[in-house]
Regions:
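A surface-exposed, glycine/aromatic-enriched loop/edge motif typical of exported proteins
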Residues: 275-307, 399-437, 487-511, 644-679, ...
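Short loop/turn motifs that connect adjacent beta-strands in outer-membrane beta-barrel proteins
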Residues: 255-261, 274, 349-350, 389, ...
């Protein structure tokens, strides 16, 4: 079930140390109101009021979103503060003070106080990109100098209400393909950068948090300072064997120098509902459907008599004639979640700090609450100026996650779907545990079979030291960092197997008569499992950047790193050995007057996955750029076209996570070999020893050759357009040989670096922001990504028919029959190519592609697309008028297909009680009076022909979704001041509110044939 947030209650308050009792009580009262944000206002003492005033306000970005972390400096007194997470600030200054507002990537804003106590600020992006900073691999670069394909997600656009950060990505950034496969609350999304480029073991991007490889979903959205996606070779080659699938870079929040302590708190209550709850056939629909299918097989005889149907429907004897809506009995229509986040940030000349704690709880979707999870977490980021140019950084975090589920959580869903409404009561009226003759009772699975508890703990630490050598060599810095991360997982399963019964009738006294169908036990059986690992990482680097003659800008990076990961609970001796990587990386950049740009990157990396002579690889990239808008001749039209930059890159990147059936594929492994003996012991022959797995001393990493061509355009300092074309050829994909001649004498096929694949496409982003007047502001943004991949080689034997070959087609291309409609007469069946099984009138008819008179797997052809969308897009807007604001965002996917079928579409051939189907199927299956029905004939047996993958049961899973929407109103300042607070904002917001799709049975984003 996809979840959506229909209503949410938030409360934010800052600087609470000076609150009066009255103000505290007021905040507690307001915290019970929905969608309310509150910030407390300090009460200055009497002596301060005589010489100073308290100035406060809110800082917004170009999208009219709150901008946290903005530095506010009182120029005369040098006092400083920073904005909280909702962009609010408060500072006590002289009435004639001058305030300077600054933030990375935005123009400095200097205002005179002139006795004003309320000063709202709108920050504008740098009209020139000369000073804007972008996070790149192992550092930062000036935005103007960046010629790699890098996409950033503004912090204000990150939905802080999500529990898994991966669920934020869909439709938000050009080049990102993200889908949420599971509908279970609390689950994350799968995502790829520019789609899938390999059919090898690892196609997921590298995720780095503060430069350390970590799980994206462990990052609290509240803690994020910057979020960037690195897409092309120039941006990722520096990561060598880890960068082939793209890189996600996240930096976490830090304290600001010159800021007094600011305490921010956020509490949130959310109501979550499924985007689409499946509708199954009710009792009457099922019995009518089953009677038709039964009569079709039994020469007109019906299974349910009119008298029996009446008893099931009128409820006269619910023990023997039950009528249960299992979806309503097992699942709730909605559930809730709660979140609390508190952080403290500040800084002085010596120390800057950011400390945060959070708690998230999500209640279950079952009746009653049988499944829930909670997730307390903490983080801290401390910068200490040991000396004038020496900074020590300490970054600590811990995430603890607990999930509680029914014991049979996986099978509960399908049993709830498939169990027919008239199969069995939840329990018999005398309390006897009920179970059908075949299958199980969903109520028992939820309430009587035990439970699972899953505990996960992630402890992460990072310590770094930065030395600035600029007093001696301008622009030179050194950095060293070390991290230690520990992951621990525990699973406790307490299962129970109760004795169950099935009522067969009533005796003369009217009491139920039972047959015992399961001899169970009344005690809990304990099963437990533990997993864990620890990871260390060491990095040392030198960076340099300087400007010569006000024209030549030169930069460089040289870095060494090493990483080791050890399994705490290995399954074998081989798995107990640490996983190790090490290497060096470098970057050289040059620009002339910010017009012409050249950049080179390299990674020289080693992995112990490979043989000693093949462990290290060199991965270079090069890029050029030309910002024509900085030419002198461009000046006359610079007010129209303010930025125009062309860029191109090419490089080679690696992937050492190649998979295979063994860890050290370069080593041969010996095994017992049947077929010959090596002596005897006690009269019993001893098997000989031979090569079980042949070693491959040439095993190596995958190589990705990437090319990117892009253009950046900005018009009238308000409309930005970025477009990139990309092409990638992946080679050396580690795959099992398709066939090895028997004369070679090996028991298994070896793995070799043989596979090849191509991926290409285009991604683009558009932004527009405009302040129309003092009352109206508008911002619009959108992005689009298209990619298509295809297999070039996979070492499989050539198909017996060219149309069956997977080479030249997308990875995981769907195959099936071409459906020609339904058989309408017996003569049509007799005069058609032989179909699957024994088709009947109303069954599907398939095309005989090869013309041999038989429809079989030789007639499979490529149909539709794949389950991963080729088209991904998103667009939205923020509009504000005075104290009112509206925001919305749409997300969509296209060129994606899937098959429907299985137990929720086709009735069971073996278990009548496990034969329920979707209501849409029950109302739209083929009958003589419905010759053009949506679904083929339903049958209690002999319908194999209708279950094969084909164009008939393949569906278009494209959709467009209203991903988020919010309407807000901010009370006037005068009203707030009378209440003793600085800001009150009422709003209504929601997530996943509307979905537009041709597919109606369930949420089209769910990758499942049954729902």
């Amino acid at each position: 079930m996809r979840t959506c947030i229909d209503n949410r209650k938030r409360k934010v308050f800052n600087d609470i140390k000076h609150l009066s009792t009255k103000a505290v009580l007021l905040i507690i009262f307001l915290s019970l109101l929905p969608a309310l944000q509150v910030m407390a206002m300090e009460t200055p003492d009497e002596t301060q009021q005589k010489s100073t005033i308290r100035v406060q306000g809110r800082v917004l970005d170009e999208f009219n979103q709150p901008l946290p972390g903005v530095s506010i400096l009182a120029v005369k007194s040098t006092k400083g503060v920073i904005t909280d997470i909702d962009g609010n600030y408060s500072i006590e200054v002289a009435p004639d003070e001058k305030l300077e507002f600054s933030y990375i990537g935005y123009q400095k804003n200097v205002v005179l106080v002139n006795g004003r106590k309320d000063i709202p600020i709108k920050m504008e992006p740098l009209t020139s990109e000369l000073k804007e900073v972008t996070v790149v691999g192992y550092g930062t670069q000036r935005k103007a100098s960046v010629i790699g394909a890098i996409t950033g997600l503004p912090v204000g656009k990150i939905n802080r209400s999500v529990n898994k950060l991966s669920n934020v990505l869909a439709g938000q950034m050009a080049g990102v393909v993200a889908v949420q496969r599971s509908g279970e609350p609390g689950e994350g999304s799968d995502f790829w950068i520019r789609g899938v480029s390999t059919f090898g073991a690892n196609n997921r991007p590298l995720v780095l948090v503060d430069g350390i490889e970590r799980d994206l979903n462990l990052v609290d959205p509240e803690d994020i300072e910057t979020f960037s996606i690195l897409k092309d070779a120039t941006a990722t080659a520096i990561y060598g064997v880890r960068g082939a699938n793209g890189v996600v870079l996240i930096t976490t929040r830090k304290g600001k120098e010159g800021s007094k302590p600011v305490i921010s708190a956020r509490a949130e209550f959310s109501i979550l509902q499924p985007t689409k709850m499946p509708k199954m056939a009710n009792a009457q629909e099922f019995m009518e459907m089953y009677n038709f299918a039964y009569a079709d097989n039994k020469n007109g005889e019906e299974f349910y008599s009119p008298e029996a149907m009446a008893k099931y429907l009128n409820g006269s004897d619910p023990d023997l004639y039950p009528n249960i809506n299992w979806m309503d009995e097992i699942y709730k229509n909605s559930t809730t979640s709660e979140r609390v986040n508190i952080n403290v940030t500040g800084g002085s000349e010596k120390v800057k700090y950011y400390v945060a704690g959070s708690y998230y709880k999500e209640n279950g979707v079952f009746r009653p609450d049988k499944g829930l999870g909670y997730n307390p977490a903490s983080s801290s980021n401390l910068d200490i100026n040991l000396f004038k140019n020496t900074v020590l950084n300490i970054n600590l975090s811990n995430q603890y996650d607990v999930k509680k589920q029914p014991n049979n959580n996986a099978s509960l869903w399908i049993y709830t779907f498939k169990t027919i409404p008239i199969a069995i009561p939840k329990k018999y009226s005398d309390g006897t545990v009920a179970r059908p003759t075949i299958g199980d009772n969903p109520y028992n699975l939820l309430n009587l079979n035990g439970y699972n508890e899953l505990f996960t703990n992630n402890a992460q630490s990072l310590i770094g030291l930065t030395q600035d050598f600029s007093p001696w060599i301008k622009g030179l810095k050194a950095n060293i960092k070390f991290s230690w991360d520990a992951y621990n997982y525990a699973h406790l399963n307490r299962s129970k197997n109760p004795s169950t019964y099935y009522a067969t009738g009533r005796n003369e006294d009217g009491n139920l008569m039972y047959t015992k169908n399961n001899d169970g036990n009344d005690y809990l059986v304990l099963y437990k499992d533990n997993k864990g690992n620890r990871t260390t990482y060491l990095e040392a680097s030198l960076t340099y950047e300087n400007l010569f003659a006000n024209a030549h800008r030169v930069g460089g990076l040289f870095l060494f790193n090493m990483r080791e990961k050890t399994d705490n609970f290995p399954d074998s001796y081989i798995m107990s050995l640490p996983y190790r990587n090490q290497g060096i990386a470098g970057r050289v950049t040059y620009s002339y007057k910010d017009r012409y740009f050249i950049e080179g990157n390299f990674g020289y990396n080693g992995s112990e996955n490979f043989a000693p002579k093949k462990r290290f690889g060199f991965f270079p990239s090069a890029a050029i750029g030309y910002m024509i808008s900085n030419e002198a001749f461009w000046e006359p039209i610079s007010h129209i076209v303010s930025v125009l930059k062309f860029k191109g890159s090419y490089g080679i990147i690696g992937n050492d996570q190649i998979g295979g059936n063994r860890r050290f594929a370069f080593n041969s492994e010996m095994a017992d070999v049947n077929g010959y003996t090596f002596g005897t012991t006690g009269g019993n022959p001893i098997s000989g020893i031979g090569t079980g797995y042949p070693g491959n001393p040439y095993v190596s990493w995958e190589e990705a050759k990437k090319m990117n061509i892009g253009v950046e355009l900005e018009l009238y300092n308000s409309l930005k357009l970025n477009v990139d074309y990309f092409h990638e050829r992946r080679s050396g994909i580690f795959i099992e040989r398709g066939a090895v001649p028997s004369v070679v004498g090996v028991n298994v096929n070896p793995y070799l670096n043989l596979g090849e694949m191509e991926n290409k496409g285009v991604d683009a982003s558009l932004e527009y922001y405009k302040t129309i007047n003092k009352d109206w502001n508008i911002s619009v943004r959108g992005n689009f990504t298209y990619n298509r991949n295809k297999k070039l080689y996979d070492d499989q034997p050539s198909a017996n028919y060219p149309y069956k070959d997977v080479i030249g087609k997308p990875w995981n291309q769907q195959f099936g029959y071409i459906a020609l409609g339904y058989f309408r007469t017996e003569s049509e069946i007799q005069n058609s190519p032989k179909q699957i099984g024994n088709p009947r009138v109303g069954d599907l008819k398939y095309k005989d592609i090869n013309g041999d008179g038989i429809v079989d797997t030789d007639d499979y052809v490529a149909i539709g697309r794949t389950a991963i969308p080729e088209i991904n897009y998103g667009f939205g807007a923020n509009i504000s008028y005075k104290d009112f604001d509206v925001a919305f965002f749409f997300q969509g996917i296209g060129n994606v297909t899937g098959f429907i079928g299985g137990e929720t579409i086709d009735m069971s051939d073996t278990n009548q009680l496990f034969s329920n189907v979707y209501q849409d199927v029950a109302l739209n299956y083929w009958r003589p009076d419905r010759p053009n029905a949506k679904y083929p004939r339903l049958a209690i047996s002999g319908s194999e022909n209708n279950k094969a993958p084909s164009t008939h049961n393949q569906v278009d899973k494209s959709f467009m979704r209203l991903k988020s929407a919010e309407i807000g109103y901010t009370l006037p300042k005068e009203v707030c001041h009378k209440m003793g607070i600085s800001l009150v904002r009422f709003y209504v917001s929601g997530t996943n509110l509307l979905t537009f799709s041709k597919f109606k049975l369930w949420d089209p984003e769910i990758d499942n044939s049954q729902g």
